[in-house]
C-alpha cells in the first residue's frame, strides 16, 4: 500500500485522532447496542495504538441526525461496550472517557487530560452539519485535538467529510489504520493483480446500482455470475419474456452493452438458466421452478435462482482462485427464496484455496447465516465504499492519507 500506515508512525505520548466506524445498530430507545461487529472490527487498531502508548481520541458518526443534536443517536452507549471489549486481555482496566461534544472547550479540555494508553470517545460527529459539509473550520477544530490522524473507517472512506478528508489538511501525518489497510490490500489486489481465474458474483435487485461495478470488473475477471432481480433486466435485453419479474425497462440498452462487452473481452457472462417463480411477492407465495429461454407464465415473477443455476455457479466458483461477491441471488430475506444465496455462500466458503472477498449487507448476512463467515478470507466492512472501490473510483478518505 502506498499510503502511510499506523505501523509507520511513532505514537508514543502523542494525541492520536482516530476516525472509526461505530455506526452500530441500537435498540429503539437508543440505549442498547444490538450488534457490536463494527466496534470489534476496529479493536486491533485501537489496541495497537494503546500498546504503543498513544493518547487516543476516537471519533465516529452514528445514524443520520441531520446536523442536530439528537439523544437517540448518541455514542454514549458505546463507552461501556468499548470498555468491556478492551478489558479482555489488558491487565489494568482501560480508561475510556466520553466527551459530550466532538469540538469546543469541553472536548479540548478532556483531550488535554488524556494520559498515554487512555481513550477519549467524542460524541457523534454528525450532530454538527459541518461534518458532512466538509467545512474547513470544523475540520480545523477536529485537527486541533491531535498531532496524528488515523483513518480506520473504511465504510466512510467514499465520503469527503470533515473527519475523513478535511481534517487531513490540518495535520502533518495522516495514516491508515489496520482495518483500512486490510480492506485496501484485499480489494486493491483483487483489482490490480488477482490470482486467476478471477470470478465475480454480482447480485441484487437493480442493474442501475451495480452497472459501474460490472463495467469495471469486465476488464479484470474471467467469469461474471449474475443473480438477483438484476438478472431479469439482462435476460429481457436478450429477448426473453420474464413475466412479472423485476425489469428496469430504461436499462435494457446498458444491460445489452455489458453483454456485448463481455463477449468482446472473452469473459464468461453467466445468467441464471432456471428460476424459482412466485405468483406474488410474498413469503407464502405459490412457487414453481422454470427453466429454459421461453416465456415465463404471464403473472409470475422470479424471486430466486433455480437448482441448475446453483449447480452452474457452484462449478465456476469451485474453479476460481479469486472470488469477489456482492449482492444476493434472490429475495434472501424470505426463506422460500434464500436457497440460491445460501448455496453461493456455501460454494464460496468451500473453495478454501481461493482469495474470497465479500461485500454488501445481504451477502455478508448470508455467509453468517450459513455459518461459514470464518471460511471467507475477507468480509468487507464498507458497503458503499467497497462498491465505489470496485467501480474503480478513488475514495476521498483514502486519497487524503499521507503517501509513504
From Swiss-Prot:
Gene3D superfamilies: Phosphoglycerate kinase, N-terminal domain (3.40.50.1260)
Pfam families, sorted: PGK (PF00162)
Main localization (coarse): cytoplasm
Keyword Nucleus: no
Protein's GO biological process: gluconeogenesis; glycolytic process
InterPro entries, sorted: Phosphoglycerate_kinase, Phosphoglycerate_kinase_CS, Phosphoglycerate_kinase_N, Phosphoglycerate_kinase_sf
The entry's keywords: ATP-binding, Cytoplasm, Glycolysis, Kinase, Nucleotide-binding, Transferase
Primary enzyme class: transferase
Coiled coil feature spans: none
Catalytic reaction list: (2R)-3-phosphoglycerate + ATP = (2R)-3-phospho-glyceroyl phosphate + ADP
Annotated positions binding ATP: 210, 333, 360-363
EC numbers for this chain: 2.7.2.3
Subcellular locations according to the entry: Cytoplasm
GO molecular function annotation: ADP binding; ATP binding; phosphoglycerate kinase activity
Keyword set includes Ribonucleoprotein: no
GO CC field: cytosol
Domain of life the protein comes from: Bacteria
Binding locations of substrate: 21-23, 38, 61-64, 126, 159
Pathway: Carbohydrate degradation; glycolysis; pyruvate from D-glyceraldehyde 3-phosphate: step 2/5
Subunit structure: Monomer.
Family from the record: Belongs to the phosphoglycerate kinase family.
PANTHER family according to UniProt: PHOSPHOGLYCERATE KINASE (PTHR11406), PHOSPHOGLYCERATE KINASE 1, CHLOROPLASTIC-RELATED (PTHR11406:SF23)
Name the record gives this protein: Phosphoglycerate kinase
Native organism: Acidobacterium capsulatum (strain ATCC 51196 / DSM 11244 / BCRC 80197 / JCM 7670 / NBRC 15755 / NCIMB 13165 / 161)
Amino acid at each position: 500500500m502506498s499510503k502511510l500506515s499506523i505501523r509507520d508512525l511513532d505514537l508514543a505520548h502523542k494525541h492520536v485522532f482516530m476516525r472509526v466506524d461505530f455506526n452500530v445498530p441500537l435498540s429503539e430507545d437508543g440505549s442498547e447496542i444490538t450488534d457490536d461487529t463494527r466496534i470489534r472490527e476496529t479493536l486491533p487498531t485501537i489496541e495497537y495504538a494503546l500498546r504503543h502508548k498513544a493518547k487516543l481520541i476516537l471519533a465516529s458518526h452514528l445514524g443520520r441526525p441531520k446536523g442536530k443534536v439528537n439523544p437517540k443517536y448518541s455514542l454514549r452507549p458505546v463507552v461501556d461496550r468499548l470498555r468491556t471489549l478492551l478489558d479482555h486481555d489488558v491487565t489494568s482496566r482501560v480508561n475510556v472517557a466520553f466527551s459530550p461534544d466532538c469540538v469546543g472547550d469541553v472536548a479540548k479540555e478532556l483531550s488535554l487530560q488524556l494520559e498515554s494508553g487512555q481513550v477519549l470517545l467524542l460524541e457523534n460527529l454528525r450532530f454538527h452539519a459541518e461534518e458532512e459539509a466538509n467545512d474547513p473550520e470544523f475540520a480545523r477544530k477536529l485537527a486541533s485535538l491531535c498531532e496524528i490522524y488515523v483513518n480506520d473507517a473504511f465504510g466512510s472512506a467514499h465520503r469527503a467529510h470533515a473527519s475523513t478528508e478535511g481534517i487531513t489538511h490540518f495535520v502533518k501525518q495522516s495514516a491508515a489504520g489496520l482495518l483500512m489497510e486490510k480492506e485496501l490490500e484485499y480489494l486493491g489486489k483483487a483489482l490490480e493483480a488477482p490470482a486467476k481465474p478471477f470470478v465475480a458474483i454480482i447480485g441484487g435487485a437493480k442493474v442501475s446500482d451495480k452497472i459501474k461495478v460490472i463495467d469495471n470488473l469486465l476488464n479484470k475477471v474471467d467469469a461474471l455470475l449474475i443473480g438477483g432481480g438484476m438478472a431479469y433486466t439482462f435476460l429481457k435485453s436478450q429477448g426473453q419474456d420474464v413475466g412479472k419479474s423485476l425489469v428496469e425497462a430504461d436499462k435494457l440498452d446498458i444491460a445489452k452493452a455489458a453483454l456485448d462487452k463481455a463477449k468482446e473481452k472473452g469473459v464468461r457472462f453467466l445468467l441464471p438458466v432456471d428460476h424459482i417463480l412466485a405468483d406474488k411477492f410474498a413469503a407464502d407465495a405459490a412457487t414453481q421452478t422454470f427453466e429454459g429461454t421461453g416465456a415465463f407464465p404471464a403473472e409470475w415473477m422470479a424471486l430466486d435462482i433455480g437448482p441448475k443455476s446453483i449447480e452452474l455457479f457452484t462449478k465456476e466458483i469451485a474453479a476460481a482462485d479469486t472470488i469477489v461477491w456482492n449482492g444476493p441471488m434472490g429475495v434472501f430475506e424470505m426463506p422460500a427464496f434464500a436457497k440460491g444465496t445460501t448455496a453461493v455462500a456455501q460454494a464460496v466458503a468451500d473453495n478454501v484455496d481461493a482469495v474470497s472477498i465479500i461485500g454488501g449487507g445481504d451477502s455478508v448476512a448470508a455467509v453468517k447465516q450459513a455459518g461459514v463467515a470464518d471460511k471467507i478470507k475477507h468480509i468487507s466492512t464498507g458497503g458503499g465504499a467497497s462498491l465505489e472501490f470496485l467501480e474503480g473510483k478513488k475514495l476521498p478518505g483514502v486519497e487524503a492519507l499521507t503517501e509513504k
